[in-house]
Amino acid sequence: MKITWLGHSGFRIAIEQAVLLVDPWLTGNPLFPADRREEALAGATHILITHGHGDHTGDTVAIAKERGLPVVGIYDLVTWLQEKEGIDGIGFNKGGTVTLGGARVTMVQATHSSSMSGEAGPIYTGTESGYMIAGEGHVIYLSGDTDIMADMGWMGEYHRPDVGILSAGGHFTMDMKRAAFAARKYFDFRTVIPCHYRTFPLLEQSAEALKEGLPGVEVIEPQVLVPIDI
């Protein structure tokens, strides 16, 4: 299994026979090198989105049309994109599981907000979500944009994720200290990868507080387009 950061909250996850593009905001992303777009997209099988905000949906429609990839996510957002943009999609909801190229993807709770920009103001696009992604003997908890929440308790106990990809840049999500607290209290991760940080000055620029708060856990600060082997 390989997890490759695309900057901000974007990832490329190669697991089982699937290559998932998670929240692919590439165009205009200060951390993503535009001349390496093809490298990021090569072999992708699905686009997995956590919510409607532009720094997460980003290039979703463009990639879906260009590559003929299905967009996977919360029913409201996916069906709206299907009707508006004519793309393929797999819409489901909290507690539901879909199998993508052999990987089992279960939608779980997050606490944030979800909308897209419209001419008359924000357009509601369903609720925000996280995912448990199971395959190759591992379970990844992809938090999506969220703060700490009590639901993490049963989510950790039921799904038993060993890898956490946690939005932890603060301001819009939990910060590194809160993410460390959540990981200690609710999960038993072997590996934690922070995201939604370093993109803008108002977000945290380092994961040192996360590392300090998780002794004994491998905290990997991702580098853009450098694969992490799990």
UniProtKB/Swiss-Prot annotation:
It holds the Pfam family Lactamase_B_2. Keywords: Hydrolase. One of its GO terms (molecular function) is hydrolase activity. Gene3D superfamilies: Ribonuclease Z/Hydroxyacylglutathione hydrolase-like. Belongs to the UPF0173 family. PANTHER family: UPF0173 METAL-DEPENDENT HYDROLASE MJ1163, UPF0173 METAL-DEPENDENT HYDROLASE MJ1163-RELATED. This is UPF0173 metal-dependent hydrolase RHOS4_08540.
